[in-house]
A protein has these predicted regions:
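N-terminal secretory signal peptides that target proteins for export/translocation
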Residues: 1-3
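Sec-dependent N-terminal signal peptides
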Residues: 5-14
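Carbohydrate-interacting regions of secretory-pathway proteins
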Residues: 19-148
Length: 148
Protein backbone atom coordinates (compact mmCIF):
# COMPACT_ATOMS: atom_id res chain seq x y z
CA UNK A 1 0.00 0.00 0.00
CA UNK A 2 1.30 3.44 -0.89
CA UNK A 3 0.78 5.87 1.94
CA UNK A 4 1.85 9.47 1.78
CA UNK A 5 1.50 11.09 5.15
CA UNK A 6 2.55 14.55 6.15
CA UNK A 7 2.65 15.48 9.79
CA UNK A 8 3.22 19.09 10.74
CA UNK A 9 3.63 19.31 14.49
CA UNK A 10 3.12 22.84 15.64
CA UNK A 11 2.40 23.87 12.05
CA UNK A 12 2.31 27.61 12.17
CA UNK A 13 1.99 27.48 15.94
CA UNK A 14 5.00 29.73 15.81
CA UNK A 15 3.77 31.74 12.84
CA UNK A 16 2.89 35.22 13.90
CA UNK A 17 2.71 38.76 12.70
CA UNK A 18 5.69 40.88 13.60
CA UNK A 19 3.30 43.44 15.08
CA UNK A 20 0.92 41.33 17.15
CA UNK A 21 1.43 37.66 17.84
CA UNK A 22 -1.24 35.44 16.30
CA UNK A 23 -1.00 31.69 16.53
CA UNK A 24 -2.61 29.95 13.58
CA UNK A 25 -2.86 26.45 15.03
CA UNK A 26 -4.20 25.69 18.49
CA UNK A 27 -2.88 22.11 18.56
CA UNK A 28 -6.40 20.69 18.82
CA UNK A 29 -8.58 21.76 15.89
CA UNK A 30 -8.43 23.07 12.34
CA UNK A 31 -10.37 26.20 13.32
CA UNK A 32 -9.50 28.98 10.85
CA UNK A 33 -8.40 26.46 8.22
CA UNK A 34 -10.23 25.06 5.20
CA UNK A 35 -9.32 21.77 3.56
CA UNK A 36 -10.82 18.48 2.47
CA UNK A 37 -11.66 16.68 5.73
CA UNK A 38 -11.08 13.36 3.95
CA UNK A 39 -7.37 14.25 3.86
CA UNK A 40 -6.70 16.71 6.71
CA UNK A 41 -7.01 16.16 10.45
CA UNK A 42 -5.41 16.89 13.81
CA UNK A 43 -3.72 13.95 15.52
CA UNK A 44 -1.71 14.17 18.74
CA UNK A 45 -1.30 17.95 18.47
CA UNK A 46 -0.20 17.85 14.83
CA UNK A 47 -1.83 18.73 11.53
CA UNK A 48 -1.86 15.57 9.42
CA UNK A 49 -2.42 15.33 5.66
CA UNK A 50 -2.90 11.88 4.14
CA UNK A 51 -3.03 10.56 0.58
CA UNK A 52 -3.45 6.77 0.44
CA UNK A 53 -4.43 4.11 -2.11
CA UNK A 54 -7.76 3.72 -0.32
CA UNK A 55 -8.30 7.48 -0.09
CA UNK A 56 -6.33 9.25 -2.86
CA UNK A 57 -6.45 12.97 -3.52
CA UNK A 58 -7.70 14.13 -6.91
CA UNK A 59 -4.57 16.05 -7.84
CA UNK A 60 -2.97 18.56 -5.53
CA UNK A 61 -5.02 19.65 -2.56
CA UNK A 62 -4.25 22.11 0.19
CA UNK A 63 -5.15 23.10 3.72
CA UNK A 64 -5.81 26.83 3.43
CA UNK A 65 -5.67 29.49 6.16
CA UNK A 66 -8.96 31.41 5.85
CA UNK A 67 -9.11 33.37 9.11
CA UNK A 68 -7.63 36.67 7.98
CA UNK A 69 -4.78 37.99 5.89
CA UNK A 70 -1.25 37.84 7.24
CA UNK A 71 1.19 40.62 6.50
CA UNK A 72 4.76 40.34 7.77
CA UNK A 73 5.28 37.06 9.59
CA UNK A 74 7.78 34.55 10.87
CA UNK A 75 7.09 30.90 10.12
CA UNK A 76 8.57 28.05 12.10
CA UNK A 77 7.54 24.40 11.69
CA UNK A 78 8.66 20.90 12.50
CA UNK A 79 7.59 18.29 9.97
CA UNK A 80 7.70 14.58 9.31
CA UNK A 81 6.87 13.20 5.88
CA UNK A 82 6.44 9.54 4.97
CA UNK A 83 6.74 9.22 1.20
CA UNK A 84 5.79 11.78 -1.38
CA UNK A 85 6.36 15.48 -1.81
CA UNK A 86 4.69 18.40 -0.08
CA UNK A 87 5.35 21.96 0.94
CA UNK A 88 4.18 25.13 2.62
CA UNK A 89 2.49 27.74 0.43
CA UNK A 90 2.78 31.43 1.23
CA UNK A 91 1.42 34.54 -0.49
CA UNK A 92 -0.88 32.23 -2.44
CA UNK A 93 -3.97 32.70 -4.57
CA UNK A 94 -7.10 30.55 -4.89
CA UNK A 95 -7.43 28.65 -8.19
CA UNK A 96 -11.17 29.03 -8.76
CA UNK A 97 -13.12 26.38 -10.60
CA UNK A 98 -10.79 23.55 -9.63
CA UNK A 99 -12.15 20.08 -8.97
CA UNK A 100 -11.95 19.94 -5.19
CA UNK A 101 -12.22 23.59 -4.10
CA UNK A 102 -8.90 23.50 -2.25
CA UNK A 103 -6.49 24.25 -5.10
CA UNK A 104 -4.14 27.20 -4.76
CA UNK A 105 -1.12 28.61 -6.52
CA UNK A 106 1.78 30.62 -5.22
CA UNK A 107 5.23 30.41 -3.72
CA UNK A 108 5.96 27.11 -2.01
CA UNK A 109 8.77 25.93 0.22
CA UNK A 110 9.06 22.25 -0.77
CA UNK A 111 9.91 19.25 1.36
CA UNK A 112 9.80 15.53 0.75
CA UNK A 113 11.02 12.19 2.07
CA UNK A 114 13.80 12.04 -0.56
CA UNK A 115 16.53 14.50 -1.42
CA UNK A 116 15.34 16.01 -4.72
CA UNK A 117 12.80 18.68 -3.75
CA UNK A 118 13.39 19.52 -0.09
CA UNK A 119 14.60 23.08 0.24
CA UNK A 120 13.60 24.33 -3.20
CA UNK A 121 11.41 27.36 -3.85
CA UNK A 122 8.57 26.35 -6.15
CA UNK A 123 5.95 28.42 -7.97
CA UNK A 124 2.88 26.18 -7.66
CA UNK A 125 0.50 26.61 -10.61
CA UNK A 126 2.44 29.47 -12.20
CA UNK A 127 6.22 29.21 -12.58
CA UNK A 128 7.59 25.82 -11.51
CA UNK A 129 10.99 25.60 -9.83
CA UNK A 130 12.23 29.08 -8.94
CA UNK A 131 15.40 28.10 -7.11
CA UNK A 132 17.15 24.95 -5.98
CA UNK A 133 18.31 23.99 -2.50
CA UNK A 134 21.27 26.17 -1.58
CA UNK A 135 20.39 28.97 -4.01
CA UNK A 136 19.72 32.42 -2.61
CA UNK A 137 16.13 33.46 -3.25
CA UNK A 138 14.91 37.01 -2.78
CA UNK A 139 11.26 37.95 -3.25
CA UNK A 140 10.37 41.63 -3.51
CA UNK A 141 7.04 43.42 -3.63
CA UNK A 142 6.06 45.38 -6.73
CA UNK A 143 4.72 48.96 -6.68
CA UNK A 144 1.26 47.65 -5.72
CA UNK A 145 2.61 45.68 -2.77
CA UNK A 146 2.28 42.32 -4.56
CA UNK A 147 4.83 39.60 -5.15
CA UNK A 148 5.62 39.26 -8.88
Amino acid sequence: MISKKLTLPLLLASCFSLHAEKHLFDGKTLNGWDGNPAHWSVQDGSIVGENTEKNPTKGNTFLIWKDGTLKDFDLSIDYKIEGGNSGIQYRSFIKSGKHDGWRIGGYQADFESGDRFSGICYGEAFRGILSLRGDKTKLSLDAKGKLP
